[in-house]
Amino acid sequence: MLDKLLEADAIGLRLEWVGGLPLWEAHPTYRHQKAVDRIRQSIRPKEGGCPCVHVADVYVRFPDGSYKRPDIAIFGREPEELDEAITLLPEAVVEVVNRGYKAKDLEIAPRFYLSQGVKDVVVFDPYTLLVLHLRPDGAFRHVSPVELDLACGCTLTV
């Protein structure tokens, strides 16, 4: 499956396989990438927290067999996989909304990540500055810039 996803990437499609269904979007814009880079630069561990290992736009294979490419995935330790999809479950994910793909980023992705056991899901819309922070126990709305504490012991600014 990963080979097919990488073939799609080679022709300019960002393809994911979620719950047995293919989802695609065009490659991200400069605005999107600037937001991802800014957020990644802000990720840091709180005292005694996890090491906050974070990667951008890398395939993660989830427990149900789905393949997704979170804009940012935050792990509690270094993943073992270097040349294939990561199978370690992220502690948290951040998705930055792409214009034209709001439904995927605001409705499909958060529900999916939480169903797979991700503890914190953050969705940022760089056009409206809306920040949604979703956890198994609730959802919280913020306006960027905002500093968020994650369950794993990391802090980030969105």
Label for each model-derived stretch:
Residues 1-158:
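Gly/Pro/Ser/Thr-rich low-complexity, intrinsically disordered segments predominantly at protein N-termini
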